[in-house]
Amino acid sequence: MALTDPLGDLLTRIRNGQRARKDSVLSPASKLRARVLDVLQREGYIRGYSEEDLAGHSGLRIELKYFEGQPAIQHVARVSKPGRRVYSGSKDLPRVRNGLGITIVSTPRGVLSDAEAREQNVGGEVLAEVF
């Protein structure tokens, strides 16, 4: 069965893993998923990730992060979906929780957080919001 929204699947695996208090979760690998995980790691929402071989396919093992027993990610949501894409210019990028969270944006310069995109003055597709 084909997956219609691989990024939505990744975010759901992270959300479910943290709700179940898992140390790590597995996800199929792709370049977009790895770039999104790079942003989450840079911003301190996950401890890290590594590529693994999963029965002949490459996968990603995502090390989840907790702070005083609570998940580092309180909320994660997909913004731009396969049926409705959402684009934003650098000056119009949404702020999550008044700047306490991040928006993940796919730009011509790669997948960036909203702060990085504003700093580089680039807009793009708003992929997800995290806090």
Curated annotation (Swiss-Prot):
Record-linked Pfam families: Ribosomal_S8
S-S bridge residues: none
Domain of life: Bacteria
SUPFAM superfamilies in the cross-refs: Ribosomal protein S8
Gene3D superfamilies: 3.30.1370.30, 3.30.1490.10
GO biological process, one term: translation
GO cellular component terms attached to this protein's record: ribonucleoprotein complex; ribosome
Xref: InterPro entries: Ribosomal_uS8, Ribosomal_uS8_CS, Ribosomal_uS8_sf
GO MF, any single term: structural constituent of ribosome
UniProt keyword annotations, A-Z: Ribonucleoprotein, Ribosomal protein, RNA-binding, rRNA-binding
Quaternary data: Part of the 30S ribosomal subunit. Contacts proteins S5 and S12.
Biological function: One of the primary rRNA binding proteins, it binds directly to 16S rRNA central domain where it helps coordinate assembly of the platform of the 30S subunit.
Protein name as catalogued: Small ribosomal subunit protein uS8
Organism: Rhizorhabdus wittichii (strain DSM 6014 / CCUG 31198 / JCM 15750 / NBRC 105917 / EY 4224 / RW1) (Sphingomonas wittichii)
